[in-house]
């Protein structure tokens, strides 16, 4: 669940996730973020004043702006431009093997995987790159794999209003590989279907067959 983030200048234009908002937080400034990283270095037993770590707080804060850039983007903007002159094409549009990375909301360690996304157009289509961008918008947030899967499908269904959407995500979770049970190489698969993909088994079979070919 996202909290609305207020900019230092009280700009409330950043998109809010569809989940209900229970808290409103003021976004910390860059200096506060860097100070927080410095505190973590001290807590880990490091000396933030040694040569190799002097610029680390600044670098981490800058990296987080990119890694969690999905909070400042909205699928509505990405999927807002569509095309209707597609020669009557109304069959499945599938973009598969979309590589992505995200971060587990429980431990803030990476989730690395691939997404396969399909939809059945209802008179209009979007540029193929837009589907990949929607994946990145939700991946570049603190997430669970189940949430990313559902959010991708929901946004495409809600904005494009196709006859159906299918999403499969295959990913490795570093919280399982690097800590706790330390099971390297294990993968998690999640799926969600809407519309015809949910109601018609043959459409699900087509989707699953195509992503495996």
UniProtKB/Swiss-Prot annotation:
Gene3D superfamilies per record: 1.10.286.10, 3.30.1130.10
Residue positions binding Zn(2+): 104, 107, 175
Pathway membership: Cofactor biosynthesis; 7,8-dihydroneopterin triphosphate biosynthesis; 7,8-dihydroneopterin triphosphate from GTP: step 1/1
Main enzyme class: hydrolase
Superkingdom of the organism of origin: Bacteria
Catalyzed chemical reaction(s): GTP + H2O = 7,8-dihydroneopterin 3'-triphosphate + formate + H(+)
Alphabetical list of InterPro entries matching this protein: GTP-CH-I_C/QueF, GTP-CH-I_N, GTP_CycHdrlase_I, GTP_CycHdrlase_I_CS, GTP_CycHdrlase_I_dom
Pfam families recorded: GTP_cyclohydroI
Oligomeric and partner information: Toroid-shaped homodecamer, composed of two pentamers of five dimers.
NCBIfam families: folE, PRK09347.1-2, PRK09347.1-3
Protein name: GTP cyclohydrolase 1
The species this protein was found in: Brucella abortus (strain 2308)
Gene expressing this chain: folE
């Amino acid at each position: 669940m996202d909290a609305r983030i207020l900019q230092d200048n009280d700009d409330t234009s950043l998109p809010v996730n569809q989940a209900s908002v229970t808290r409103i937080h003021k976004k910390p400034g860059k200096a506060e973020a860097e100070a927080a990283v410095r505190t973590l270095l001290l807590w880990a037993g490091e000396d933030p004043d040694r040569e190799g770590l002097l610029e680390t707080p600044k670098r981490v804060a800058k990296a987080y702006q990119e890694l969690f850039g999905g909070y400042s983007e909205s699928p509505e903007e990405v999927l807002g431009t569509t095309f209707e002159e597609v020669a009557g094409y109304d069959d499945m549009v599938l973009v598969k093997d979309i590589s992505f990375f995200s971060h587990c909301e429980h431990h803030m360690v990476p989730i690395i995987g691939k997404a396969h996304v399909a939809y059945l157009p209802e008179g209009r289509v979007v540029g193929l790159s837009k589907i990949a961008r929607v994946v990145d918008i939700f991946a570049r947030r603190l997430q669970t794999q189940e949430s990313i899967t559902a959010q991708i499908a929901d946004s495409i269904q809600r904005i494009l209003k196709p006859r159906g959407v299918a999403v499969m995500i295959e990913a490795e979770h570093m919280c399982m590989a690097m800590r706790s049970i330390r099971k390297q190489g294990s993968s998690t698969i999640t799926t969600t279907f809407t519309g015809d993909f949910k109601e018609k088994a043959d459409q699900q079979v087509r989707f699953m067959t195509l992503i495996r070919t």
